[in-house]
Amino acid sequence: MSTIGYIGASICLLGVLSSLFSISHIVRDINSLRDEVEGRVDEFKVLADDTWQRLLVLQSPTGETENVMPSIFRSKRFVYPGMCNCDSNSQGCPAGPPGPPGLPGKRGDEGVVGDLGRSGASGISLAAVHHIPGGCINCPAGPAGPPGQQGPVGPQGFPGVVGTCGPSGDDGQPGPAGPLGDKGAQGPKGFDGADGPDGMPGTAYFPGAVGQPGEPGWLGQPGLPGKHGEPGQDGEEGPKGAPGTPGSNGRDAYPGQPGKAGEPGAVGKDANYCPCPARRDSKTESVHEPPAASQNGGYRKAKRH
C-alpha cells in the first residue's frame, strides 16, 4: 500500500473515532435532559395536586375535602363523607341553623421536620394551567436570601440613540508659531516702474597727467599650437659622395634545375681492325699467336659504307 493509502486510512479512522465520541457525548446530553424533564414533570405533578386540594377546600362549604378517589378497600358501614349526613327520605329540606362551635381540641404533637422541597414552578405558568382567579397566589414574602454570586456579563446592548449635537466650543488659544516654510516658487516678472526724476548734474573732472609706466606683467599662458605650414620647395641636388665600402659576399645561390637532354650526335666512321690470322688444319696442333698490337689497341677504325 502506498503512502497515500496509509494517509487516507488514518483520516478515515480518525473520522470514525470522532463520530463515536460525538455520539456518546450526544447520548449523555440526551440522558441528562431526560432526567431534568422528568424532574420538572414530577414537580409539576406535586404542584398540580396541591393546587387541586386547595381548590377543593375553597369550594367545600364545611372546609373539609371530599374523598374524590374512593378507596379500593371495602368501606365501613354508616361512614359517609363529612360534607352532609341528611336523611335519605327527606326531600327538599331546608338547611338547618349552624350548630354551636365545638370545644377547642388539644394541641397536637409537633411533626418531624420534612425534607427541603424542590424549587417551585413559575407562578404565571401555574395560574395559566389551573385558572386561579386573580393571577398568582398571594403568599407572604419570605426573608431576603443571601446575595447571590455575581452573574456573567450580559450580552452587548443595542446601540443607543444618537445624541443631540453639543454647543460649539470656544475658540482655542493661538498656537505657537510654526517653522519657516519652504521657499516658494519665483513669482512672475512685475511691470516696469515709472521713470524716476532726473538726477543732479555731476561734477566735471578733467583728465590728469600721464602716469609712470608700470612694471612688466606676468608671463601669460602658452598659446594654442599653430596650424601646420605648407610643404616647402625641393632643394637643389647636392654633390656626388665618395664610393662606399664594398659589401660582404652574398650567400650561394640554390642549385639550378637540370638542363634539357642534348640532340643526338652524327654517325661516326667505321673503325679499322686487324684481320684474323689464317687457320691451320685441325689435325695439326698449332698455337695461335696473338695479333700484333696496334696503336689503337688492336683494332682499327673501319670505314662505314
From Swiss-Prot:
Residue numbers spanned by region Triple-helical region: 96-125, 142-204, 208-252, 256-270
Region Disordered, annotated ranges: 95-117, 146-305
Skewed-composition ranges (Basic and acidic residues): 278-288
InterPro entries hit by this protein: Col_cuticle_N
Pfam families, per database record: Col_cuticle_N
UniProt keyword terms in alphabetical order: Collagen, Cuticle, Disulfide bond, Repeat
Function in brief: Nematode cuticles are composed largely of collagen-like proteins. The cuticle functions both as an exoskeleton and as a barrier to protect the worm from its environment.
Subunit structure: Collagen polypeptide chains are complexed within the cuticle by disulfide bonds and other types of covalent cross-links.
Protein name as annotated: Putative cuticle collagen 90
Gene: col-90
